[in-house]
Amino acid sequence: MADYVLAIDQGTTSSRAIIFDHSGTIVATGQKEHEQIFPRAGWVEHDPEEIWTNVRDVVGQALGRASVRASNIAAIGITNQRETAVVWDRTTGKPVYNAIVWQDTRTQRIVEELGGSEGAEKYKARVGLPLATYFSGPKIKWILDNVDGAREAAERGDLLFGNTDTWVLWNMTGGVNGGVHVTDVTNASRTMLMDLDTLSWNPDIAADMGIPVSMLPEIRSSSEVYGKDREEGLLAGVPIAGILGDQQAATFGQACFEIGMAKNTYGTGNFMLMNTGTEQVASENGLLTTVCYKIGDQPQVYALEGSIAVTGSLVQWLRDNLKVISTAPEIENLALTVEDNGGAYFVPAFSGLFAPYWRADARGALVGLTRYVSLGHIARAALEATAFQSAEVLDAMKADSGVDLTELKVDGGMVANEVLMQFQADILGVDVVRPKVAETTALGAAYAAGIAVGFWNGEQDVIDNWAEDKRWTPQMDRGDRDRLYRNWKKAVTKTFDWVDDDVEN
């Protein structure tokens, strides 16, 4: 029997391939960043062909570093940035436009027109999501409306849509030569086009958006064999057997299998998911109802999700745009030069505000500035913004679910930052727990694939493999915590109502 499972993690800033052994331990990794394309304010794009090239490269890197042959890989799992929309020609295999990324806000007018008098809640009862620029459906409509010949080609049946999971899978399984056009329930649940009850495309909503259903991939479970890597591929013949959107994959990798268990992933943005079991919980507090996972023929499991647009990308912005730091980890040392935020609060509403506000008219603000404030204070305010936004989402989860969390499992790149993790525990008032394998997104996809082919026996193996690495316990006085949180909420209100007729994006 093969000894390893390989996960492809097609993320917002990079693509990675990670090889895991049976204990869930990382054996080798390959990683390559792709270009972030900003054609206009509020627009964010990726080149799908660059992504596909990078995926092949990182698979080769991982196999080489592990000295592992394809014959020793039991299965391949795919996890991906969700919502990001790719539209391509089924005959040529070429994208008709760049991928429109989940952070992109160009579809605001489309969203407002679709909502009409019913507003953002128009489809929420059916799809679990508010009408927002975040989701795939309006992005597909924008491409069909704005790329010459795209709508006609789509109506002829010549175009295919997918998030990057589908794009990678289609290419891996042969592309124009019989590529499998499939997505899983978790990714489909982020398009605004899938009915949460039936787990099938909703033709009425697709028609409202002018999207031919023929473009849409077949919806399958998160753990089953979808196809095999093409003959000329580095993993020729290896089954591709797991697909989970990145945040659902992290939830799976964190072994959040019981109702009320939650995790928070700290990446480009932050995403907190709470398992709600086989019952959908409709949010009254600005959260999303989404599919958490579906293992083969087992019933689907749902989740509440709080999505935060900008957290880690704020640190990248300080590095790349303002040149305040030269590498992202330097933010911690800069923050340690001061004891607090000096009264400064940084609300990074670069793409509007996601949960729990859903304010597309908001834009970033740095408030509370005096001549006392230094770069150290701004660095600390940037880190604290991540913790404050997560606290607001956790409050909403408590209100919707009636569950009081006793601890929060965390993962993602920013959990290496000790200053942030301690402040997160302080502001939440609960323990924050980091697992030994922090790459839970890739791990979750690996588990889904491995379970499908019998490499792992099921959720119990995931639970048995999970191990705690570090725990942060709240240390802040409650009065201080409440004062800081009140000031944060005041700062958030200063970002509202910025985008109007005088401001395009």
Swiss-Prot record:
Binding site for ADP: 12, 16, 268, 312, 413, 417
CDD domains referenced in this protein's UniProt entry, alphabetically: ASKHA_NBD_FGGY_GK (cd07769)
Entry annotated with the keyword ATP-binding: yes
Annotated catalysed reactions: glycerol + ATP = sn-glycerol 3-phosphate + ADP + H(+)
Binding site for ATP: 12-14, 268, 312, 316, 413
Pathway(s) where this gene product acts: Polyol metabolism; glycerol degradation via glycerol kinase pathway; sn-glycerol 3-phosphate from glycerol: step 1/1
UniProtKB keywords: ATP-binding, Glycerol metabolism, Kinase, Nucleotide-binding, Transferase
UniProt xrefs under InterPro entries: ATPase_NBD (IPR043129), Carb_kinase_FGGY (IPR000577), Carb_kinase_FGGY_CS (IPR018483), FGGY_C (IPR018485), FGGY_N (IPR018484), Glycerol_kin (IPR005999)
Any single GO BP term: glycerol catabolic process
Listed EC numbers: 2.7.1.30
Regulation: Inhibited by fructose 1,6-bisphosphate (FBP).
Binding site for glycerol: 82-83, 134, 246-247
Binding residues for sn-glycerol 3-phosphate: 12, 82-83, 134, 246
Any one annotated GO CC term: cytosol
Molecular function GO labels: ATP binding; glycerol kinase activity
PROSITE patterns recorded: FGGY_KINASES_1 (PS00933), FGGY_KINASES_2 (PS00445)
Entry's family note: Belongs to the FGGY kinase family.
PANTHER family, alphabetized: GLYCEROL KINASE (PTHR10196:SF69), SUGAR KINASE (PTHR10196)
Described purpose of this protein according to its UniProt entry: Key enzyme in the regulation of glycerol uptake and metabolism. Catalyzes the phosphorylation of glycerol to yield sn-glycerol 3-phosphate.
Protein name as it appears in the record: Glycerol kinase
Organism: Beutenbergia cavernae (strain ATCC BAA-8 / DSM 12333 / CCUG 43141 / JCM 11478 / NBRC 16432 / NCIMB 13614 / HKI 0122)
